[in-house]
Amino acid sequence: MEKVLRKVFHESERIEVESDLLGAARAVCQHQEGLACILGTGSNSCLYDGEKIIGNVPPLGYILGDEGSGAVLGKLFLNALFKGTLPDGMKEDFLQSSDLSYPEIIQRVYRQPMANRFLASTSLYISEHLDVPALRDLVKENFRDFFHKNIAQYVRHDLPVGAIGSIAYHYRDLLQEVAEEEGYKLSTVAKSPMEGLVAYHAY
């Protein structure tokens, strides 16, 4: 990757190729210690010392882990939808608005590629119906699991938490609520790391 980039940016003195997690950490924590999170289709987190990652709880992917992610939120939503624990009429409304049937959803999840992206796509419907308490509770449950199973493992309540990604960004108010309830300070939330990375490298 570095060789490819150097062909394009041949006048650059220095080219770094690092992980998306380090990019997220630098974007939200800059040169300070902190807990950095990615909350998008998948999820990840790390303990960051202001320069490098010094701790990482493995996210395990959407089947075994990825708490806080869009894929897991989709799993929670579809489970509640078809098991009848959401308000009356919501299942019919979702199926109509998504132009999907129950068999088609099962097909997309179990027999087609990129099931995680399909599951995460249900977030659009959820975000448009956040006036429904049951859906707000699902979003908060997803974030709470993320804090309990990932962030809490770093045992650093003293550090600020920063988050990158579409799920963090679109549900930032609920993420803020959960962070405070769990005893953390949410410092920065951004949809993309780009602006933060520009600031990091300009310093």
Question: Could you tell me what each predicted segment is?
Answer:
Residues 1-89:
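Phosphate-binding/catalytic loop of phosphoryl-transfer enzymes
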Residues 3-9, 28-35, 76-203:
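ATP-binding/phosphotransfer module of carbohydrate and carboxylate kinases, centering on a glycine-rich
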